[in-house]
Swiss-Prot record:
Pfam families: HSP20. PROSITE patterns: SHSP. Residues 87-114 have a biased composition (Low complexity). This is Small heat shock protein hspK. Coiled coil: none annotated. GO terms for biological process: protein complex oligomerization; protein folding; response to heat; response to hydrogen peroxide; response to salt stress. Belongs to the small heat shock protein (HSP20) family. Residues 80-122 are annotated as: Disordered.
């Protein structure tokens, strides 16, 4: 059986692993649970500017903060808040019972999977990502942070970082006469 490579599926797998890693790291250092997630990001670098686009569906502008630190680092933070008690839904790792039998004569395996009956008026799992996020990017040397622009439209946050005009390695200085 041949399986085609799906970059979106692979990105989601990596995203999920990173979220689990972040959650374990933070949970082990504190007594309370903090949801941290990493929004999908697209970075484009061209001659005149760098464009960073975040996919932030369900987050308003006032739930996002964009700052530049003294170390010339762009820091983007925000929080996607729950609506209607989404924090209390069971996670996607709900218990599922599985029985497997193998027929050695034909080398086939039959697996029967049964899920526990769902409670009335309850959803089976929470697939909506909520919680806080933080992303940071080291800006190129010579970046004028006052010229950085950010816009948000239809759940997409776009940050435009203008590049400093490239200077030549050597600058020719003309010699003028005193007259």
């Amino acid at each position: 059986m041949t399986m085609e490579f799906d970059p979106r599926r692979e990105r989601r797998k990596v995203q999920k692993k990173m979220n689990v890693f972040d959650h374990r790291l933070i949970s082990s250092n504190s007594n309370h649970r903090i949801n941290i997630w990493r929004p999908t990001v697209s970075i484009k670098d061209n001659k005149t500017h760098i464009s960073i686009i975040f996919e932030l569906a369900g987050i308003s502008r006032d739930q996002i903060s964009i700052e530049v630190t003294k170390e010339n680092t762009l820091v983007i933070t925000g929080e996607k808040k729950s609506k209607g008690g989404l924090n209390n839904l069971p996670s996607s790792s709900s218990s599922i019972n599985s029985d497997s039998t193998t027929n050695t004569n034909t080398n086939t395996t039959t697996t029967t999977t049964t899920a526990p009956p769902p409670p009335s008026d309850a959803q089976l799992k929470n697939i909506i990502t909520i919680g806080k996020f933080i992303r940071s990017y080291k800006l190129p040397p010579g970046t004028d942070s006052s010229k950085i622009k950010a816009t948000m439209d239809d759940g997409l946050l776009e940050i435009i970082i203008p590049k400093d005009t490239p200077s030549e390695d050597r600058l020719k200085i003309p010699i003028q006469s005193k007259l």
